[in-house]
């Protein structure tokens, strides 16, 4: 299986702050709690495709 680069987007402001490699066959989108430098706080970042 090949890995694909995907961006993690802040759910509060919409900024794409992080990129990760993920398996494209997954059905659900990845959600992580990360620091957003635009909001200045920890928010949920969702995988954008």
From Swiss-Prot:
NCBIfam families: PRK00504.1, rpmG_bact
InterPro entries assigned: Ribosomal_bL33, Ribosomal_bL33_sf, Ribosomal_zn-bd
GO molecular function list: structural constituent of ribosome
Keyword Ribosomal protein: yes
Taxonomy, superkingdom: Bacteria
Pfam family, one: Ribosomal_L33
GO biological process: translation
One of the record's GO cellular component terms: ribosome
Keyword Ribosomal protein on entry: yes
Family: Belongs to the bacterial ribosomal protein bL33 family.
Record key words, sorted: Ribonucleoprotein, Ribosomal protein
Official protein name in the record: Large ribosomal subunit protein bL33A
